[in-house]
């Protein structure tokens, strides 16, 4: 869609599940979005960066959300590889 100024505007931008790449629909009320802060390993303080993970309701229904979050955090370097 375009607004009065001629700029492209989307009314709804769907999210994708970080674990399965499925589109999270507007009526998926079981989905969650987690924002995890990046911590400086030397000082233990929060930096300006965050990592955001969206988990769809289907993954949560199967009980796989905790495994998916650990796998994604390992891939992003938030958790050590031998965790």
UniProtKB/Swiss-Prot annotation:
What InterPro entries does UniProt report for this protein, alphabetically? Ribosomal_eS21, Ribosomal_eS21_CS, Ribosomal_eS21_sf
Compartments, as annotated in UniProt: Cytoplasm, Cytosol; Cytoplasm; Rough endoplasmic reticulum
What are the GO BP annotations of this UniProt entry? regulation of cell population proliferation; regulation of translation; rRNA processing; translation
Q: Is the Aminoacyl-tRNA synthetase keyword given for this protein?
A: no
One GO cellular-component annotation of the UniProt record comes to: cytosol
**The entry's keywords:** Cytoplasm, Developmental protein, Endoplasmic reticulum, Ribonucleoprotein, Ribosomal protein, rRNA processing, Translation regulation
Question: Record's Pfam families?
Answer: Ribosomal_S21e (PF01249)
Q: Which domain of life is it from?
A: Eukaryota
Q: What is its main location?
A: cytoplasm
Briefly, what is this protein's role? May be an associated component of the ribosome rather than a core structural subunit. May act as a translation initiation factor. Has a role in regulation of cell proliferation in the hematopoietic organs and the imaginal disks of larva.
Description of how the protein assembles with itself and partners: Component of the 40S small ribosomal subunit. Interacts with sta.
Q: What is this protein called?
A: Small ribosomal subunit protein eS21
Source organism per UniProt: Drosophila grimshawi (Hawaiian fruit fly)
């Amino acid at each position: 869609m375009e607004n009065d100024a001629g700029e492209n505007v989307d009314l709804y931008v769907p999210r994708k599940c970080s674990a399965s790449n499925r589109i999270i629909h507007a009526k998926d009320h079981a989905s969650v979005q987690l924002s995890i802060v990046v911590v400086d390993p030397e000082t233990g303080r929060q930096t300006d960066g965050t990592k955001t993970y969206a988990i769809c309701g289907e993954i949560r229904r199967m009980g796989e959300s905790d495994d998916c979050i650990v796998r994604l955090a390992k891939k992003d370097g938030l958790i050590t590889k031998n965790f």
